[in-house]
């Protein structure tokens, strides 16, 4: 598994993501602040999020510039 740091500005949420859990963003942001970014986002080769929308939103809320990602083929 190859983990790369990717700029948040280059990552795109999946438009039809069925989960709408914005209430979890604050807690995930607190966890990232305390423990660091432990689980990378999974994105496709076009940098669209496959898994990790809440982590993406939490990272944005923390002002992070890039996040660890696994690029799925």
Task: State where each predicted segment sits.
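Short, charged/polar connector segments at secondary-structure boundaries
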Residues: 1-73
């Amino acid at each position: 598994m190859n983990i790369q740091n990717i700029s948040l500005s280059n990552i795109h949420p999946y438009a039809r993501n069925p989960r709408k859990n914005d209430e979890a963003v604050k807690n995930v942001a607190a966890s990232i602040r305390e423990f660091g970014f432990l689980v990378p986002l999974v994105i496709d080769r076009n940098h669209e999020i496959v898994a990790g929308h809440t982590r993406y939103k939490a990272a944005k809320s923390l002002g992070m510039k890039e996040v660890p990602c696994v690029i799925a083929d």
